[in-house]
UniProtKB/Swiss-Prot annotation:
UniProt keyword annotation of Metal-binding present: no
Gene3D superfamilies found in the cross-reference section: Aldehyde Dehydrogenase, Chain A, domain 1, Aldehyde Dehydrogenase, Chain A, domain 2
Keywords: Acetylation, Cell projection, Cytoplasm, Lipid metabolism, NAD, Oxidoreductase, Phosphoprotein
Annotated gene: ALDH1A1
Binding site residues for NAD(+): 167-170, 193-196, 226-227, 246-247, 269-271, 349-353, 400-402
Similarity-based family: Belongs to the aldehyde dehydrogenase family.
The protein's name in its UniProt record: Aldehyde dehydrogenase 1A1
N6-acetyllysine modifications at: 91, 128, 252, 353, 367, 410, 419, 435, 495
Length: 501
């Protein structure tokens, strides 16, 4: 343990074996009904790591049936004390902590994450998420209501039922636990589809779920592709709720499928094009580093990425110059290699999309300050890229890039920058840097975003609700608000002979 309280990095695993590659239903491993498998790759080397069973509609049907059986009235899960649900989540956290090195190595090999970030940040967040949600299990309470007349009225917060959960590839394990932990804390059962690019860590945790003692059918995991397994979850008539993290385009399809099937409840955490405003009175040194990390963390593959950086005119030129200097310090390479500070993009599709957007920035007149192309001869690496003189109409200023591409735009006045910051279909996150408290509060109230950070960015914790405005999604995850998404409120009124105050 370091003096700061963070764990020291362990010796890397050199012989990691991927043991768990099947479909997990009823606490057992299954082959896919179709017999199909799909390959899983290391994006840093383009080498195949293993093959995973490819679930589709028939496998989803089996998983939903298991989840429904586990949710029946009188089942071990439904009759379990809420405090016992919490104990199981605490136990799962302990097991994840035991296997922290294995899981962090998987996230790095399969997801292209820097090992240090996977071990310290992602796995650290996983443990905090599980323990936070475990503590809530016996604190999800209803109320008594003083209704008129001789009646006794109270509310119950009941679990929604069978929840379908569709995961992204950028934070595979953290998003898996963000989804299942609040759902299980509230007493739901789940059917989870990991992203096809990054299914391995969720499948490993499936074994820990069984080891922790969760009853069969409570957690089911069906790896597969979005148009097959994901679509089957979204349209399934016996799934009561679906939660999805991913692109806005897919989020629309999921909401449409939910509406056309059984009007299942939907929680969506979608894309963003988040503005970050740096005023001339900001602490420049800190603002430079924070705005840099706000974009380049995990190769820019974060929904929170501050991908529209607005800098006040009087400090613009210096800010651009120093931002370029910072971007040029990166060391690209295999994310398991000590000293490497930038890994690969997740796959060829994302790699090509990012390079296309970089080319559009060049063609539309933005000034390329550094980077602007691929790196190396294998793996999906892209040079850290900075554009200046970016106008609001350019594609790189409007579209979510999801890559290591920073756009720095100039502004003159407070009213102007607020209007420009809000001129987007997205509304996920926003930030500002200023020493002026009045300005900070004014901007925070005016920005149309689910989270606004002041003099910091990307500060995410289990205690805080997370979600977006506009086309960045519906509902909230984590914090007390996140549990509301996994309960139904029932009003119970009982006739009594006499009511007394």
């Amino acid at each position: 343990m370091s003096s700061s309280g963070t764990p020291d990095l362990p010796v890397l695993l050199t012989d990691l074996k991927f043991q768990y590659t099947k479909i997990f239903i009823n606490n057992e491993w299954h082959d896919s009904v179709s017999g199909k498998k799909f390959p899983v790759f290391n994006p840093a080397t383009e080498e195949k790591l293993c093959e995973v069973e490819e679930g589709d509609k028939e496998d989803v049907n089996k998983a939903v049936a298991a989840a429904r059986q586990a949710f029946q009235i009188g089942s071990p899960w439904r009759t379990m004390d809420a405090s016992e649900r919490g104990r199981l989540l605490y136990k799962l956290a302990d097991l994840v902590e035991r296997d922290r090195l294995i899981l962090a190595t998987m996230e790095s090999m399969n997801g292209g994450k820097l090992f240090s970030n996977a071990y310290l940040m992602d796995l650290g967040g996983c443990l905090k998420t599980l323990r936070y949600c475990a503590g809530w299990a016996d604190k999800i309470q209803g109320r008594t209501i003083p209704s008129d007349g001789n009646f006794f009225t109270y509310t119950r917060h009941e679990p929604v039922g069978v929840c379908g959960q569709i995961l992204p590839w950028n934070f595979p394990l953290l998003m898996f636990l963000w989804k299942i932990a609040p759902a299980l804390s509230c007493g739901n059962t789940v059917v989870v589809k990991p992203a096809e690019q990054t299914p391995l860590s969720a499948l490993h945790v499936a074994t820990l779920i069984k080891e922790a003692g969760f009853p069969p059918g409570v957690v089911n995991i069906v790896p597969g592709y979005g148009p097959t397994a994901g679509a089957a979850i979204s349209s399934h008539m016996d799934i009561d709720k679906v939660a999805f993290t991913g692109s806005t385009e897919v989020g629309k399809l999921i909401k449409e499928a939910a509406g056309k099937s059984n009007l299942k409840r939907v929680t969506l955490e979608l894309g963003g094009k988040s503005p970050f405003i740096v005023f001339a009175d900001a602490d420049l040194e800190t603002a430079l580093e924070v705005t840099h990390q706000a974009l380049f963390y995990h190769q820019g593959q974060c929904c929170v990425a501050a991908s529209r950086l607005f800098v006040e005119e009087s400090i613009y030129d210096e800010f651009v110059r120093r931002s370029v200097e910072r971007a040029k310090k990166y060391v690209l390479g295999n994310p398991l290699t000590p000293g490497v500070s930038q890994g690969p993009q997740i796959d060829k599709e994302q790699y090509d999309k990012i390079l296309d957007l970089i080319e559009s920035g060049k063609k539309e007149g933005a000034k390329l300050e550094c980077g602007g192309g691929p790196w190396g001869n294998k793996g999906y690496f892209i040079q850290p890229t900075v554009f200046s003189n970016v106008s609001d109409e350019m594609r790189i200023a409007k579209e979510e890039i999801f890559g290591p591409v920073q756009q720095i735009m100039k502004f003159k006045s407070l009213d102007d920058v607020i209007k420009r910051a809000n001129n987007t279909t997205y509304g996920l996150f926003a930030g500002s840097f200023t020493k002026d408290l009045d300005k900070a509060i004014t901007v925070s109230a005016a920005l149309q975003a689910g989270t606004v950070w002041v003099n910091c960015y990307g500060v995410v914790s289990a205690q805080c609700p997370f979600g977006g405005f506009k086309m960045s999604g519906n509902g909230r995850e984590m914090g007390e608000y996140g549990f509301h998404e996994y309960t139904e409120v029932k009003t119970v009124t009982v006739k009594i002979s006499q009511k007394n105050s």
